[in-house]
């Protein structure tokens, strides 16, 4: 982190004050990087996902001293560049995608270590199961559509107790009313006025397209 701090200050020192300075770090938080910056308000993280020349995601993260205008400028820049930027609502190590990936990775390591599955078993399960579906809808929307008209509300009310079951080594958060409402409202907002049957139909068509494309490739 010390080298990163020195490098960031050297970079900023030679740039005009109206230039946004972006870091592609995948681990450090901008609040740490900008501690020695003379103009920290223009420093922001633009974290791509590997391979960045194919995948469109870029996570935009400001630090405690980053200005809102710098965050918005970075978002607009990546959007104009053809990427799909995502502004984090709150600074957190690992951002969004890496934290989700790390959770999956750690559970996979546990399964291999305990002799429950081989690396090949794990990849086969993902490739032929949740992965194609997640390409189409993502984790939250997939569970929302899976419960029909009731959506995420039905999912959490019916399967909420399963969060205490030993299906993962990760400890689940308490399913409070606030957390339930955030999930339900978020999924309803994504779905909009589209009926769940249409959402499910579009999901199925897209998954078939993904699977057919993979078959042709192999």
Language-model segment annotations:
Residues 77, 110-111:
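Residues within well-ordered alpha helices
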Residues 15-16:
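Helix-to-beta-strand junctions that scaffold the AdoMet/dcAdoMet cofactor pocket
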Residues 1-7, 12:
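Single conserved hydrophobic/aromatic residue that forms the stacking wall/gate
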Residues 20-90, 94, 98:
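Rossmann-fold dinucleotide-binding core
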Residues 97, 101-107:
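Structural/interface elements that position substrates and couple domains in central-metabolism enzymes
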Residues 102, 112-114:
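AAA+ ATPase "lid" subdomain C-terminal helix
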Residues 80-83, 87, 114-218:
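NAD(P)-dependent Rossmann-like dehydrogenase/reductase catalytic/cofactor-binding core
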